[in-house]
Regions:
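Fold-level recognition of mixed alpha/beta catalytic cores in primary-metabolism enzymes, strongest
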Residues: 1-40, 49
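Metal-dependent amide/peptide-bond hydrolase catalytic core
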Residues: 29-171
């Protein structure tokens, strides 16, 4: 299962009346451009053989229909299996958002939280013990393999402390 991190990205501009947009810096337009640019982290900065999901799930900005917004707040999540690249993504988001916002006369502020690492059964000895135990209990036909899942699981914390294996039971 993938690592999971969350972030809040705030874009700050300068409000103005809708009849005088040239007097402000539109945070909604800048934030929209940031969303598109962030996807280049997935498609151009990430090794295409490494699964990476960067999702922006909320977008809140503006106060009135006729006012150029001075602030947009967006919340998102990042999922990956690559522990090294995981810790590069925060800076890539910060740099991309700041560079795009600067072009619109706005500023970007990033709050990033590392939640849980990837759950990867990498200890071959423990995997073999679990596999052999499952075969003895349920038979070889019971065992299968799964594709990677971009869901996350805090079991990763236990895996950091003790030799472990993570498995699904049942159908």
């Amino acid at each position: 299962m993938a690592s999971a991190d969350i972030f809040t990205l705030t874009v700050r501009g300068e409000a103005s009346h809708g009849s005088a947009p040239h007097l402000g810096h539109d945070a909604i337009v800048a934030a929209s451009a940031v969303i598109m640019a962030l996807q280049t982290i997935v498609s151009r900065r990430n090794n295409p053989l490494n699964a990476l999901v960067l999702t922006l799930g909320t977008f809140e900005g503006g106060q009135r229909f006729n006012i150029i917004a001075d602030k947009v707040a967006m919340d998102g999540t990042v999922r990956t299996f690559d522990p090294k690249f995981r810790f590069e993504i925060e800076e890539l988001i910060r740099q991309t958002a700041s560079d795009v916002c600067r072009g619109y006369g706005c500023e970007a502020e990033l709050e990033y939280s590392y939640l849980t690492g990837a759950v990867i059964n990498s200890n071959a000895a423990v995997v073999n013990v679990a596999r052999n135990s499952a075969e003895k209990l349920y038979g070889k036909d019971f065992l299968g393999s799964m594709e990677k899942l971009t869901g996350s699981e805090d079991f990763a914390y236990l895996m950091e402390k003790a030799p472990s294996v993570y498995a699904f039971l049942g159908g």
